Regions:
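Pre-NBD coupling/linker segments of ABC/ABC-like ATPases
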Residues: 69-109, 206
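H-loop/switch region of ABC-family ATPase nucleotide-binding domains
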Residues: 45-47, 287-289
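ABC ATPase nucleotide-binding domain signature region
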Residues: 130-199
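ABC-family nucleotide-binding domains
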Residues: 14, 20-21, 256, 262-263
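Helical segment within the ABC ATPase nucleotide-binding domain
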Residues: 25-38, 267-280
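ABC-family P-loop ATPase nucleotide-binding domains
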Residues: 1-2, 180-244, 248-251
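A short, surface-exposed alpha-helical micro-motif characterized by mixed small hydrophobic
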Residues: 52-54, 294-296
C-alpha cells in the first residue's frame, strides 16, 4: 500500500512466503491482482516454481543468472527435467530416511500453559508450521534459554533446561550467516565456540584445534581454516555453522526457517547438513512458516498457532 500511495509503477517482492502465513499469502495474491488490473507491475521472486505460478500471470525459470524458459498462466507446467536436481535429492533423502534410526520414546518435551505442547524423539525430524507467524518469535527466546516461560518448561531426558548455556539444546537462527558468526574470531575459534562443555581448555589448546583441523579438513576444505570469516562463501559459512553445532553434539537441534532466502543448490546442501544430525540420532525441529522443502525430511508435521495446535 505504501508503494501505491507513493505512485510506484513496479514493486519487487522477494521470498515473501518465508515470513507470511499461507492465509496471508492468499490475501496478498488478491491485493496484487487488484492493483495489477489498475496498471501496477509486480516482480515476484521465489525459490519455488509452483508458488510463483499460483500468483503470477507469467513465470520465468532462471539458471546461473539467465532466463532459460518463460511460462504464461495458460501454459502447461514444466516437465520434471527442470527440477531434476531436487527430485534426485528427494529420492536420496528417502533412501537415507529408511536407514536412519527410527524415532524411539520421547526424549525432549516442551510444555507450557496456553502454548502448544510437543515432544520429539531420538533421530526424528519434526516440522512445526507457524500458521499465524507469531509462535516462532515467541518460542525462540524460551528455547534458547534467554527467557523463562512463566507457565511452562522444556524437559530433556526428564530434566529441565538449565538456561542459555545448556549445551544439550542448540538453536540455529534464521539467516544464521548474519547472526551466528563472529568476524573478530578465527575460523577455528568459530568452529569451537560451543565445544567448551566437551573439551576442557579448548580455547587455549593448540593441540585440540590442530586435531580438529586435521579431522575436518577433508569435509570443510583445507583452505577455509586460513580465511577470515567475512571472506567465506555462503556455502562455507553454512558448513561452519552446522559443523559447529554437530561438534556440540546437542540432544536436540531447533532450526528457524532454515531455507529462507537460499537458492536451490544451497537449499539442497542445507538438507544434507540437517540430515547429518538425523543420521547421528540427533532430533531436529524445523520451525517454519512455509512448508516448502521442510517436508522432504519430516517424520511428523505439527501445525500451530497462538493458543495451541491445529
Amino acid at each position: 500500500l505504501k508503494a501505491v500511495v507513493a505512485g510506484n509503477h513496479l514493486v519487487v517482492l522477494e521470498d515473501i512466503s518465508t515470513f507470511i502465513s499461507d492465509a496471508e499469502l492468499e490475501q496478498l495474491s488478491g491485493i496484487l491482482h487488484h492493483y495489477a488490473k489498475k496498471g501496477m507491475s509486480f516482480l515476484y521472486i521465489a525459490a519455488h516454481f509452483e508458488e510463483a505460478r499460483q500468483i503470477c500471470g507469467r513465470t520465468a525459470l532462471m539458471l546461473n543468472g539467465q532466463i532459460i524458459k518463460c511460462f504464461q498462466a495458460k501454459d502447461k507446467a514444466p516437465d520434471p527435467f527442470f527440477l531434476h536436481c531436487t527430485e534426485d535429492f528427494d529420492r536420496h533423502v528417502r533412501e537415507q530416511m529408511n536407514q536412519r534410526p527410527r524415532p524411539e520414546e520421547n526424549q525432549i518435551v516442551f510444555q507450557a500453559e496456553g502454548e502448544p505442547a510437543f515432544s520429539v524423539a531420538r533421530g526424528e525430524c519434526l516440522v512445526m508450521q507457524d500458521l499465524d507467524n507469531c509462535m516462532i518469535q515467541e518460542l525462540i527466546p524460551v528455547l534458547s534459554g534467554e527467557e523463562r516461560h512463566s507457565a511452562g518448561q522444556i524437559l530433556i531426558d526428564g530434566t529441565p533446561l538449565g538456561g542459555k548455556n545448556d549445551r544439550r539444546i542448540a538453536v540455529i537462527q534464521e539467516l544464521p550467516v548474519h547472526s551466528m558468526l563472529f568476524s573478530n574470531l578465527s575460523y577455528l575459534d568459530n568452529l569451537c565456540f560451543t565445544l567448551d562443555h566437551r573439551v576442557r581448555g579448548v580455547w587455549g589448546s593448540k593441540r585440540v584445534k590442530k586435531s580438529l583441523r586435521q579431522e575436518y579438513a577433508e569435509l570443510l576444505g583445507e583452505e577455509v581454516f586460513d580465511l577470515p570469516v567475512d571472506r567465506l562463501t555462503e556455502w562455507q559459512k553454512y558448513d561452519l555453522i552446522y559443523t559447529r553445532i554437530y561438534l556440540q553434539n546437542p540432544k536436540v537441534v531447533f532450526c528457524v526457517q532454515p531455507f529462507k532466502s537460499a537458492e536451490v543448490s544451497l537449499r539442497i546442501h542445507i538438507m544434507e547438513l540437517l540430515e547429518r544430525f538425523l543420521n547421528k540420532g540427533i532430533p531436529v525441529v524445523i520451525m517454519a512458516v512455509n512448508l516448502a522443502d521442510s517436508l522432504a525430511l519430516a517424520d511428523r508435521l505439527l501445525r500451530v498457532r497462538r493458543g495451541g495446535k491445529v
